[in-house]
């Protein structure tokens, strides 16, 4: 069996923790094909070094707009969010979803100040979904699973890859070998496929 001590933090903070020796694995996510000059590329490239780090494919997942049941404001894009003045709830600096949002805003020709509530943030996908469910926000960007778990609607925006990063030197550790073997099993692949918005790599 593989036993994990899991700490939840944003993608950027997770990789920093890896580089500072505070963890063995760091999870982070990027678009399937991030542009070379994207904020994601500029954020993660300095933190990950070829030859020092190893990336392990973990999952594909969908990120999108988390909205109230029935999508009462008719939000289907970030343009809609900006144009409608919908109350948005963000993720904090250091989270991969904040990096993603800023990239998507730039692609859409939008600025942070175009989004009502851009400065308001919650620490997790679940907390964003809870804010929408409670009515303190109209919309946030997050994963489909968080929306479905709270009975909310979800508007897909992008496909991502979720990666696990480790140091090359950790690959021979028995626990790391066991984890990599587990990720290849059909049981794991089926479990991943059963989660809303997730798919195995």
Model segments located where?
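N-terminal segment of the mature folded domain
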Residues: 1-76
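Short beta-strand-to-loop elements that line the ligand-binding cleft
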Residues: 3-10, 112-124
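Hydrophobic residues within well-ordered alpha-helices
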Residues: 18-19, 101, 131-133
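Short loop->beta-strand "edge-of-pocket" segments that line small-molecule binding or catalytic clefts
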Residues: 79-99
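Short helix-loop capping/hinge motifs at secondary-structure junctions, enriched
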Residues: 70-76, 110, 169-175
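Periplasmic-binding protein-like
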Residues: 49-62, 152-181, 183-199, 201
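A ligand-binding cleft/hinge motif common to bilobed small-molecule-binding domains
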Residues: 29-44, 129-158
């Amino acid at each position: 069996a593989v036993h994990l001590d899991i700490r939840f933090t944003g993608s950027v903070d997770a990789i920093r923790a890896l580089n500072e020796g505070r963890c063995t694995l760091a999870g982070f996510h990027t678009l399937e094909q991030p542009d070379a000059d994207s904020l994601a590329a500029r954020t993660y490239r300095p933190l990950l070094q070829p030859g020092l780090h190893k990336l392990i494919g973990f999952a594909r997942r969908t990120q999108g707009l988390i909205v109230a049941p029935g999508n009462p404001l008719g939000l289907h894009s970030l343009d809609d969010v900006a144009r409608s003045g919908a109350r948005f709830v963000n993720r904090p600096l250091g989270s991969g979803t904040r990096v993603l949002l800023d990239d998507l805003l730039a692609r859409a020709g939008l600025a942070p100040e175009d989004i009502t509530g851009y400065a308001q943030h919650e620490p997790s996908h679940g907390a964003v979904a809870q804010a929408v469910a409670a009515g303190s926000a109209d919309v946030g960007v997050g994963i489909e699973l968080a929306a479905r778990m709270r009975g909310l609607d979800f508007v897909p925006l992008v496909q991502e890859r979720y990666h696990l990063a480790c140091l090359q030197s950790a690959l021979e550790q028995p626990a790391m070998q066991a984890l990599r073997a587990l990720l290849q099993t059909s049981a794991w692949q089926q479990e991943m496929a059963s989660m809303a918005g997730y798919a195995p790599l």
